[in-house]
Amino acid sequence: MVYVKTNNYIRKIDELGRIVIPKEVRHKLKIQENENIMITSDDSKILISKYSYLENYYNYIKSIAEYINEIYKYGIEITDRNKKIISISPSNYFIETEIIMNSIEIGKIKIYIDNNDENQKFLKLISRIISSYFDYS
């Protein structure tokens, strides 16, 4: 029989409805200060999970990656802060940049092309297109 070790924490809710998430849990889940989390309820349970803007807009992200691959024939990989969202035709040589929203890194883009000024500008453009989508959604 396999036993899974679970950590149970008892916390009080303050007058504003806030709950402190223990440092150990935040560290284990790699939750950083000012990072968004998603709270859902299921019967008598409250579930807290990390929120990924990129994962929740997978179809939009996928279409951008497919267009870049189809038009430019570039391999592309888009990740949130923890996992790969989409990867098309990766190769050995790539350049990458962060996807920034409200001064917070929400992900990274890798494009599998040579590193030069024009390609860096193209990569930053794609990053801004993706992050600007969240400003208006």
Predicted regions and their residues:
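Short hydrophobic beta-strand segments that form the core of ligand-binding sensory/regulatory domains
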Residues: I46-K50, E98-I99, E105-D114
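Short hydrophobic alpha-helical segments used for membrane anchoring or interfacial signaling
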Residues: I39-S41, G75-K83
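Short beta-strand-centered segments at strand-helix junctions
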Residues: L16-L29
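Short regulatory alpha-helical segment in sensory/regulatory domains of signaling proteins that mediates
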Residues: A65-Y72
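A short beta-strand signature within small-molecule sensing/ligand-binding domains used
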Residues: S91-I100
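Amphipathic coiled-coil signal-relay and dimerization helices
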Residues: L47-S49, K83-P90
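Short, structured interface segments
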Residues: Q32-Y53
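Juxtadomain coupling helices with adjacent low-complexity linkers
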Residues: I61-A65, I106-K108, Y112-S137
